[in-house]
From Swiss-Prot:
Protein name as annotated: Ribosomal RNA large subunit methyltransferase E
Top-level EC class: transferase
Region (Disordered): 1-20
Source species of the chain: Rhizobium etli (strain CIAT 652)
Catalytic reaction equation(s): uridine(2552) in 23S rRNA + S-adenosyl-L-methionine = 2'-O-methyluridine(2552) in 23S rRNA + S-adenosyl-L-homocysteine + H(+)
Job description of the protein: Specifically methylates the uridine in position 2552 of 23S rRNA at the 2'-O position of the ribose in the fully assembled 50S ribosomal subunit.
Length: 239
């Protein structure tokens, strides 16, 4: 069971620690103070994960079991790599037998058992390169992609929703029957066409807000379970 971290100094640092730096802007100082006092950040350091985001995936999996039985996983917007760490572990991926492919336009340090592509997912060559890297049909496509923020809520929402839609189209093109798709989204309304497409192609579509996602954050996750497969869609068109 993925439990919420307990406040304390298990990492050698007490919660409630203040950041003192007169040269730092107040907003930056507040962010850094919140970050170093975040129990999920401390737990990630303690358990060897690259980011607190690991617990978002673990919480979602605890309820919906999307990692169970996964043999190949594609991780979109992977940096710094905590989701890829989990993916490599559950698939048994090794450098000799790669079963996890990760992509991000940001540089990402190497991980055992993960083929990393430093490339914008919107690059036309990205889908083919990901499929070559993962070495077979994926059971799970996970996306933590979000567009760089501009400070304008509506613009940020639309840009991130575009990434969600592109990721969803990719998942439908590459997943094996019964596979799952998980993507980050922002509160503010999921595009109707995206939901309709996912419901047409997957047996279950739900919104998820894990406890490890900060309460003040507008992020949510959209989970599509049980890919129906492309053959059924083809038969429907013929009919």
């Amino acid at each position: 069971m993925t439990k919420a971290p307990i406040a304390g100094n298990r990492t050698g640092r007490k919660l409630g620690q203040r950041v003192k730096n007169k040269k730092m802007k107040a907003s930056s100082r507040q962010w850094l103070q919140r970050h170093i006092n975040d129990p999920y950040v401390q737990r990630a350091q303690l358990e060897g994960y690259r980011a607190r985001a690991a617990f978002k995936l673990l919480e979602i999996d605890e309820k919906y079991h999307i990692l169970r039985g996964a043999r190949r996983i594609i991780d979109l917007g992977a940096a710094p790599g905590s989701w890829s760490q989990i993916a490599a572990k559950v698939t048994g991926s090794t450098d000799e037998d790669i079963r996890v492919a990760a992509i991000d336009f940001l540089e990402m340090a190497q991980l055992p058992g993960v083929k990393i592509l430093q490339l914008d997912f919107l690059d036309p060559s990205a889908p083919e390169k990901l499929m070559e890297a993962v070495g077979g049909t994926p059971d799970l496509v996970i996306s933590d992609m979000a567009a760089p923020t501009t400070g304008h809520h509506r613009t940020d929402h639309l840009r991130t929703m575009h990434l969600c839609e592109v990721a969803a189209h990719f998942a439908i093109e590459v997943l094996g029957e019964g596979g799952h798709f998980l993507t980050k989204t922002f509160q503010g309304g999921t595009e109707r066409d995206l939901l309709a497409m996912l419901k047409q192609n997957f047996r279950q579509v739900v919104h998820v807000k894990p406890n490890s996602s900060r309460a003040e954050s507008v992020e949510m996750f959209l989970l599509a379970k049980g890919f129906k497969g492309r053959k059924a869609e083809g038969h429907a068109e013929e009919a």
